[in-house]
Amino acid sequence: EPNVYAEAIVHPTATIVGEVFIGPYVNVNANCVIRGDMNEVVINESSILMENVSIGTVPSILNSGEVAKVFLAKKVILDNNVRLMSCYIGEDCFIGANSVICEGAKVDDGSIIGPYSVVPPNRYIPKGQVWSGNPARYIKDVEKPERVGLIEKMKELQENSKEYIKEISDYSNAYMLSEELVDQGKTTSLYCPQEFEVKIVNKKYED
């Protein structure tokens, strides 16, 4: 069953199935689909999934011998319509809109994948680089203004998600129950999809 950290924000239209861990302050926006029914999906602290993101896994072991799971480190931004399959995304990465990251690929910390890019199976993207295209190719190293811009974008997206989810949930039974539990000192996520029994956890997931 999915495990959602108490401070995560999950949009009501998102679908979460199987062995999925969603860490604290993660934002999962409208129409996202996260499937951990073949292998696990781990989404760590403060990562943001924009609208229509699709995350899935393949059932087999990767060529590297590793389990074919999806792992997102802290503070990852997945823009609209991104698709991930059994890959690793490092801390502070940005994946541009409509991009595809294939199974076995690894995007290392602080890297940027341009929009409409395809990172092929088992491709390694080194730290702090910009890659783009189909297939994705090296463009340049990430510059300081780009890094600062991404930090500001993340802050803005997090605030927008919190306000939007609160606005649409204010009068729902799920939200009022959530508020009541918080007042009682119990932990709960702001919203959990009612289609699943979601276990709330208060521990960090280590790779």
Indicate residue ranges for each PLM-predicted region.
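Glycine-rich hexapeptide-repeat left-handed beta-helix
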Residues: 3, 37, 45, 51-74, ...
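Short, electropositive, low-hydrophobicity segments enriched in small/polar residues
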Residues: 22, 40, 137
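Conserved H-X4-D acyltransferase segment
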Residues: 28, 36
